[in-house]
């Protein structure tokens, strides 16, 4: 229901969970590629075994305390971390940027702000964010909104 007073809180929780999930998968991806560079002769079976081990380790470090479930290999499910390497962490940055922009746009004229932001041109992401929303790329807006949503 678009009129629900809980709508914004639920959207914040969804954004936070989505970010946490992709960050977990990204950590597995980075660790898998580090392992592959250290083990260039690894077989597909060894890669599968290591993926399950690393995914379970990342899960136990960051997700089990929140979810109350240990030893899940769920974060190893993204097979494209092997055939399209080292890009998953870019999703996390994109989600952080999206949330920052959404927060910045609240209470402003959407059309005017979008025109202003788009007219900034081609800049490095950090410089563009400073010009677009007035701050560096940061998870702080999401963390503040999450803290508020959990109250």
Regions found by a protein language model. Name each.
Residues 1-34, 38:
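Acidic/histidine-rich catalytic neighborhood
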Residues 26, 30-151:
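C-terminal, non-catalytic "cap/extension" segments appended to globular domains
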């Amino acid at each position: 229901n678009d009129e629900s007073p809980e709508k914004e809180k639920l959207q914040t929780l969804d954004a936070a969970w989505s970010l946490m999930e992709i960050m977990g998968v990204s950590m597995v991806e980075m660790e898998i590629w580090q392992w592959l560079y250290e083990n260039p002769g690894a077989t597909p079976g060894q890669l599968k075994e290591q993926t399950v081990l690393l995914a379970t380790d990342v899960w136990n470090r960051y997700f089990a305390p929140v979810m109350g479930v240990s030893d899940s290999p769920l974060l190893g499910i993204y097979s494209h971390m092997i055939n399209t390497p080292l890009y998953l962490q870019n999703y996390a940055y994109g989600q952080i940027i999206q949330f920052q922009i959404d927060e910045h746009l609240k209470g402003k004229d959407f059309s005017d702000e979008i025109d202003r932001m788009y007219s900034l041109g081609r800049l490095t992401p950090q410089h563009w964010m400073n010009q677009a929303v007035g701050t560096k790329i940061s998870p702080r807006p999401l963390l503040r909104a999450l803290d508020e949503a959990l109250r």
